[in-house]
Amino acid sequence: AAVGVDIGCGMNALRTSLTAADLPDKLAELRSAIEAAVPHGRTTGRGRRDAGAWENPPANVDAHWSTLHAEFQWLTSKYPRFLNTNNYKHLGTLGTGNHFIEICLDEAQQVWVMLHSGSRGIGNAIGTYFIEMAQKDMEQNIANLTSRDLAYFSEGSEHFVDYVLAVSWAQDYARANREAMLENVLLALRKTIDKPFTLVSEAINCHHNYVQKEQHFGKEIYVTRKGAVSARRGQYGIIPGSMGAKSFIVLGLGNPESFCSCSHGAGRVMSRTKAKKLFSVEDQIRATAHVECRKDANVIDEIPMAYKDIDAVMAAQSDLVEIVHTLRQVVCVKG
């Protein structure tokens, strides 16, 4: 249950050969092209078809789904409830909340594509179901836990084995989801910008909400990173700020006391409900004046002031990571 329901949520970032001067004067055109290329948001209600799902998934989504389908068949043969989810048609889509796609500039004015998303509807369904199952399995001992949400499976039990397989599949789905989105954002860039460009660096694709087996202090253990990124020595990671603040490409320093981990971002200083009560559309417009993005009432909960100061966060973890690039967004797409 410590992983929660947004299994495999994480970041993807890629540097291009484009510079700020290559971007169109009217960035709204670029934002519209990205919004057309990647389904985002959702339709009110719980229908299987929503605004955030594909009606007819493109070929690259089919290709990614083919790598996931065999294990999904095993999962649904034992747990057929997962057939009744947006699985295939959510692959390569953004979602809502704090998930985003951004076009950023680094300190050398080079253009980066950066995005944040996870395992979408199917990951939520897997997480919710197995959390409820763990709570039922622990019914007699649940009172001994500080929170029902920390219910767990005993290693070696049937449900433990099934959960490990299911969560691993959802993490693979999340990684493929980000890869498919990145491909389609790059297509949107090529359609919008006349100048040919190349990809300068290999994409960084990192989870910040996941579990995996690792070696620490001479033992093989399961490490859960909830809002944390793996930061082994020399390992690249991505630490985003809010939609109006800086983000960072980092190299891990391999600090053993943190289990080779670092924070995944700024983190909120207030709830979404409080942000909506405290701030107005005018506040959002002022805070994101330098960004081509939505500035309506439905994204006030994502206003930069609802998040911690990212510079303070980075200073607090200077023994965990080294900053390689500092990015500032010029286009931001939210669901």
Regions found by a protein language model. Name each.
Residues 8-9, 25-41, 56-335:
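Domain-length cofactor-binding catalytic modules of enzymes
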Residues 1-8, 12:
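Active-site cofactor/substrate anionic-group-binding motifs, chiefly glycine-
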Residues 40-48:
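Mid-sequence, gly/pro-rich, charge-dense loop/helix-turn segments that line enzyme active sites
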Residues 48-54:
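Active-site-proximal segment of RNA-dependent polymerases
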Residues 16-19:
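Acidic, low-complexity central loop/insert segments
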Residues 21-23:
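Short, polar/flexible loop-turn hinges at active-site or ligand-entry regions and domain interfaces
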